[in-house]
Amino acid sequence: MVMVVNPLTAGLDDEQREAVLAPRGPVCVLAGAGTGKTRTITHRIAHLVGAGHVATGQVLAVTFTQRAAAEMRSRLRALGAAVQAVSDFGVVRVLTFHAAAHRQLRYFWPRVIGDTGWQLLDSKFATVARAASSVRLHAGTDDVCDLAGEIEWAKASLIGPEEYVAAVAAIGRDTPLDAAQIASVYAAYEALKARGNGVPGVTLLDFDDLLLHTAAAIENDAAVAEEFRDRYRCFVVDEYQDVTPLQQRVLSAWLGDRDDLTVVGDANQTIYSFTGASPCFLLDFPRRFPDATVVRLERDYRSTPQVVSLANQVIAAAHGRVADSKFQLSGQREPGPAASFHEYSDEPAEAAAVAASIARLIEFGTSPSEIAVLYRVNAQSEAYEEALTEVGIAYQVRGGEGFFNRQEIKQALLALQRSAERSSQTEPNSPLSDVVRGVLEPLGLTAEKPVGSRARDRWEALTALAELADDEVAQHPRLDLPGLLAELRLRADARHPPVVQGVTLASLHAVKGLEWDAVFLVGLADGTLPISRALAHGAESEPVEEERRLLYVGITRARVYLALSWALSRTPGGRQSRKPSRFLNDIAPQMGQNPASSRSRRNRTATLRCRICKNDLTTPAAVMLQRCQICAADVDEELLLQLKAWRLSTAKEQNVPAYVVLTDNTLIAIAELLPADEAALIAVPGMSVRKIEQYGSDVLQLVRCRAVAVRTQT
């Protein structure tokens, strides 16, 4: 007897197959990280179409990002070709919520509204600024950004201007400005849009309005509802744990009294509550649809058992309602290395060590594009941009800008430049660090961290810049403001990484759905993860639990190699008062033991000392040179010039930034140590086996020719 294999279920595990073959009707797929959710839902769509349950044009699948939508469309096309389907699965409509609403509103608007036109606001900034001005609220750029964000949250949460004050009070929400002021701006903003911002016969809509008007059109016009529901019979929603009340309203309008809905999600990956996202719709799905098929996917095909085990331990300690849906993932890959934990004296030491570890991974064959450094807040990227630049490793900042490309840093450098030009008016005895902070204070470097998210991002970036200045002053005690600016601009100019094939630097919020062979989770100190504003709500509060889920998301991005680290102080020589993240208490070796064990960890990561003056090395550059940058060294300046000329020529030939060939500090070390052979060259900081294979013969030839020239001259 010949068994007939269904090509749409071949290769699926038992749980995936159950989800794919579930009958039409409500289906809830609870899919843990790395369990193949996209594979499962695309195969389910293909099964429903291929079995004749629904036509391709009657399926609407919605995602949260264009990238996810494109991936799903691509998989559906490939699946149709692979099984030689009569129907082209690739024509299934796969859109984001906003894109779907945009299409529907353009079609139904004339019937519902009439001749009044509408325009979509690409950005609400200018209109929010006008609204603030109209209610006599003086709002700077950061305030306007925070107001816009708060309006987005309110609309996503189905909270109007008149309910805003009571709503935020009821849930204890931290607001960037006085709640009554925000409500006034919100109301003025809606009024301005309704009047077309002064354009006759036009209504302005923001992206949330697309959803609001689409839902209202279907809810209030029976003909519109009938036409839409006749067109779309089957719905699939990805990442359902991230649905907002507004998006759920649209989905409910689409469905009407039908139940042909498949949702996929993981409440343990709910990390976007600041946008209005709520896992309650996923958690309540079986209650709303008592006959629903519920399938749990717990076989993790992404990560090694070691990574999976760590993720399970982190989420096992969760509290609250979301914790009731926690998974016990089972790693399906071959075993790999155990996750490592590292404690460092300060943040520069942590960054330098991470960069060195990344260099070793690359040396042993890991592609830079398969490595990521993940952190809680964007301002943390600066130390890693600096450290990777020092060792000549290209990087890209995902979901944000490089440190020196951020608008607030450009503004700060311009303000410092203007202050330097007026230096004659500056108190001659003022410490340079105080001068810098005095210049940065009006730009947002306040004594207390602001509440608003945009203002807080600015504050964190300016704080990082001020501490960079402190580092430079520590290395160069006689530095003045023009000299400091020159040093900072040198750092900025050195950072022009390629955008491909580089190490990824990203915040934890920017990496959902992504994965790498090697992941470094950095800055894991209490107050950073969980962040201090979450701790203010209580140790077992929902904001703290969301921070735990952020760590869980970070861990589950790693396929094979995972390192977790933290620093005891922010700056070299600072008071080592930080504690490791409380989320590590039950998972990191030696955590929670006696003080002696804690001291032994610190000793293993003690700060390196200068080989000349024996003082602590406080910057990645100093660590690279194995000496303070101000300590006198016997550098052959002529050789250094020749090395830089060779590097420039080589970089042009390879079409890469010069630092990717060899960094300035590596060239300085070569001109100082004068290595005579490969054995001596490998001892030079920054010279790996790979670098020697690529450039060793050229470098040694330059050193030898220079030695001959020196002997001839003498």
Swiss-Prot record:
ATP binds at G34, T35, G36, K37, T38, R39, R302. Its cofactor is Mg(2+). Residues 305-560 form the UvrD-like helicase C-terminal domain. It comes from the Bacteria. One of its GO terms (cellular component) is DNA helicase complex. Residues 10-304 form the UvrD-like helicase ATP-binding domain. It catalyses: Couples ATP hydrolysis with the unwinding of duplex DNA by translocating in the 3'-5' direction; ATP + H2O = ADP + phosphate + H(+). Residues 633-713 form the HRDC domain. It is an enzyme of class 5 (isomerase). Keywords: ATP-binding, DNA damage, DNA repair, DNA-binding, Helicase, Hydrolase, Isomerase, Nucleotide-binding. DNA-dependent ATPase, stimulated equally by ss- and dsDNA. Has both ATPase and helicase activities. PANTHER family: ATP-DEPENDENT DNA HELICASE UVRD2 (PTHR11070:SF69), UVRD / RECB / PCRA DNA HELICASE FAMILY MEMBER (PTHR11070). Belongs to the helicase family. UvrD subfamily. This is ATP-dependent DNA helicase UvrD2. It comes from Mycobacterium leprae (strain TN).
